[in-house]
């Protein structure tokens, strides 16, 4: 039985595959998928929060708030923390700040293996420096965008870019999660390119974060690249992705609803949990919908300011700006309605 659920994004349709235990054929098919998925241990899997980065009024990283948030996310059930991605405003920070942010987060949690920092920059030398640092401090892996300034780049050009990074870093400990977010980067990562990269660097290219919001693309990734850890960038898509053999998520709304995502992770393959899964899925969709009421990054920080009772969370890195006071009040009022 397929239940169709419209997400807040008008162009995204989430298909939740629910179990109909009255049909033996469907039950056996689902059980086979569950067993295959549970046996498949990806190097990187689970719930990873695309962490927002708190800053002071002058744009300095607020390491106290960051440390508190990272510790809280791990306690709430996140398997890992993806620092300095799109949600973390990574490309608004210089190299020194990005190194400081990663080191502070690792030191406060004493869990370097939980971290998947974004290390991409427009300059390949800077990306190599950040990636080498991440490897040296014990990060589980790094999340790498394709080169995103020049548009219309060929697969050959993108391959040379990634190859240059990997060869330039020259460390067998390196593990790379490719980052497919074509609506922002304008540079899609094609299946043929993934094939070529995995063939050239089978022990290094271990995953892909797909933030396209397209379930069909996730399905095709799982079918074509079963050894690749396929991670969705959309919280509500984690459940159907797991049912297709995916590895988990790296998402923005996990800053706010990590516990609900963990309920889905822990229960999706169990019998008689449909009600529990639906309740958590509904909450995730509502939190994500609210986070996108205005600018998503500013709204998430506004929600975190309320949750932690810390106005320091409201500050944004230029060129992004905080929500207007009236918008903040509306968001906080709706938060109270969702979590009375």
Feature roles, as predicted:
Residues 182-285, 291:
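Catalytic alpha/beta core domains of metabolic enzymes, predominantly
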Residues 41-49, 54-55, 60-186:
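Active-site beta->alpha loop and helix N-cap motifs at the rims of alpha/beta catalytic domains
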Residues 20-39:
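Short, Lys/Arg-enriched N-terminal segments with co-localized hydrophobic residues
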Residues 4-6, 23:
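Basic polycationic patches enriched in arginine
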Residues 48-52, 76, 243-246, 253-340:
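C-terminal alpha-helical cap/extension of soluble enzyme domains
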Residues 11-12:
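Targeting/processing segments of secretory and organellar proteins
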């Amino acid at each position: 039985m397929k239940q169709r659920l419209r997400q807040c994004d008008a162009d995204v349709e989430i298909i939740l595959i629910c179990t109909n235990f009255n049909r033996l054929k469907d039950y056996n098919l689902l059980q086979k998928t569950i067993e295959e998925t549970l046996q498949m241990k990806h190097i990187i899997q689970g719930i990873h929060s695309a962490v927002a980065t708190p800053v002071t009024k002058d744009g300095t990283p607020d390491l106290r708030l960051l440390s508190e948030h990272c510790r809280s996310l791990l306690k709430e059930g996140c398997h890992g923390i993806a620092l300095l991605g799109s949600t973390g405003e990574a490309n608004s920070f210089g190299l020194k700040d990005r190194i400081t942010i990663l080191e502070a987060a690792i030191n406060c949690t004493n869990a370097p293996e939980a971290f998947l920092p974004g290390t991409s920059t427009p300059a390949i030398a800077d990306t190599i420096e950040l990636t080498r640092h991440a490897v040296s401090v014990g990060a589980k892996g790094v999340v790498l965008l394709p080169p995103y300034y020049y548009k219309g780049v060929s697969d050959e050009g993108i391959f040379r870019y990634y190859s240059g990074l990997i060869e330039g870093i020259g460390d067998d400990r390196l593990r790379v999660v490719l980052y497919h977010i074509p609506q922002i980067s304008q540079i899609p990562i094609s299946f043929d390119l993934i094939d070529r990269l995995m063939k050239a660097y089978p022990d290094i290219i271990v995953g892909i974060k797909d933030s396209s919001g397209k379930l069909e693309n996730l399905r095709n990734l799982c079918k074509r690249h079963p050894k690749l850890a396929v991670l969705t960038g959309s919280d509500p898509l984690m459940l159907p992705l797991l049912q297709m053999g995916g590895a988990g998520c790296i998402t923005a709304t996990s800053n706010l609803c990590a516990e609900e995502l963990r309920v889905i992770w822990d229960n999706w393959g169990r019998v008689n949990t449909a009600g529990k899964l639906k309740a958590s899925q509904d909450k995730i969709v509502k939190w994500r919908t609210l986070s996108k009421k205005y600018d998503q990054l500013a709204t998430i920080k506004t929600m975190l300011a309320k949750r932690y009772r810390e106005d320091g969370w409201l500050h944004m890195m230029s060129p992004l700006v905080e929500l207007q006071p009236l918008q903040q009040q509306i968001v906080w009022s709706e938060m109270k309605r969702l979590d009375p």
